[in-house]
A protein has these predicted regions:
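Active-site C-terminal subdomain of aminotransferase-like
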Residues: 255-258, 264-354
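Short glycine/serine- and small hydrophobic-enriched flexible loop segments
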Residues: 107, 134-138, 331-335
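Glycine- and acidic
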Residues: 28-29, 81-89, 113-120, 152-155, ...
Length: 354
């Protein structure tokens, strides 16, 4: 094999201490692309040094996100970063793992199989909430037109307590929906079910029940809300429905309060979202949404995509993304099972700090 002066130079570069290298001595532009490449180890160190002053996620007691996964899970996820979650024809087994996760959650939330439930992964609960809201809006619009309601007379509205997460405000702004907020106060640290119907009219696309309010940690009384909605539906042509924002609670309540009725056991709960990167115990970001039946997910919101190699239905706001979080979620379901999640959740019920 022939060698040249360039080989000598390349070899010498590895002998130079990292912080004595030429690349470490030059000023790297912050907001435009630099002219020449640098060695991988130096790029790694420079980026790592940039992050030194940030907080340590493991020490952040205020985070809502999972900050630790087992080495086996981390390894599995790092080995699958390149898989595109939407390319189901190229990665059929990855698609099957997503399908398994959807069915596991549907079973956990008592989805009635006779109504042909469906669901999908998302990049987090915010996207899942957007999808749940869109489904309610499109369904309301179709039903309103069938009733002869003038849908141009006023904007549709969504009813929710003032303990809402900002994604619902985004939903209402992005998709031209009025947000009708039921105030919380000292006597009502969750949705005031005695007043909720005061905010409802025939332009209401649905009511959001929150399972785990950010400010208080409380669950809205979904069973009481369901009874109120059922009574309303008996006396009105306009059908009210409930979406459960279970970003925190939907992966917590089944293990800690299994007798609490908040999910698809209640007839008027039509969709539920949760965050896999909270009590699903997966690194950010992954979320999930399940609809109880076909009629609650309007067909016009489902797109058949064929240009990735095979026709496939997709319901999402985002498109290409790594499948590693989905794979991490299935790993956790497989690894922990019901009893494992129950033990983990029971360890978080009442934390004490002294």
């Amino acid at each position: 094999m022939l060698y040249s002066e360039s080989d000598k130079t390349r070899k010498e570069s590895y002998r130079v201490p990292l912080f004595a290298s030429e690349e470490e001595q030059i000023r790297i532009p912050n907001y435009k692309l630099k002219d020449e490449p640098i060695e991988a180890k130096i790029a790694y160190q420079l980026v790592k040094d940039e992050l030194m002053d940030e907080g340590n996620a493991r020490q952040n007691l205020a985070t809502f996100c999972q900050t630790y996964m087992e080495p086996e899970a981390t390894k599995l996820m790092s080995e699958t970063l390149e898989k595109n979650a939407v390319d189901k024809s190229e990665y059929p087994q990855t698609a099957e793992l997503e399908n398994k996760c959807v069915n596991i959650l549907a079973d956990l939330w008592h989805a009635p199989s006779a109504e042909k439930y469906s669901g999908t992964s998302t990049v987090g609960s915010s996207e899942a909430c957007m999808l749940g809201g869109l489904a309610m809006k499109f369904r309301w619009r179709k039903k309103a037109e069938e009733r002869g309601l003038d849908i141009a007379k006023q904007r549709p509205n969504l009813v929710i307590s003032s303990g809402y997460q900002v994604c619902w405000e985004k939903f209402c702004v992005y998709w031209d929906v009025d947000m009708r907020v039921v105030p919380m106060d000292e006597a009502h640290l969750r949705l005031d079910t005695d007043k909720v119907l005061d905010y409802v009219d025939e332009y209401t696309i649905g009511i959001v029940g929150i399972l785990g309010i950010t400010y208080t940690g409380e669950f809205d009384d979904i069973q009481a809300l369901d009874k109120i909605v059922a009574g309303y539906n008996k006396t009105h042509d306009h059908e009210l429905v409930i979406h459960i924002d279970g970003a925190s609670g939907a992966m917590f309540a089944p293990f800690v309060e299994p007798d609490l009725k908040w999910d698809f056991q209640l007839d008027n709960v039509v969709s539920i979202n949760t965050s896999g990167h909270k009590y699903g115990l997966v690194y950010p970001g992954v979320g999930w949404i399940i609809w109880r039946g076909e009629e609650y997910l309007p067909r016009e919101l489902v797109f058949d995509v064929s240009y990735l190699g095979g026709s496939m239905p997709t319901m999402a706001i985002n498109f290409s993304r790594s499948a590693s979080q989905i794979i991490g979620q299935y790993y956790n379901f497989l690894r922990y099972g019901f009893s494992g999640y129950k033990k983990s959740m029971n360890g978080h019920v009442i934390p004490h700090f002294t």
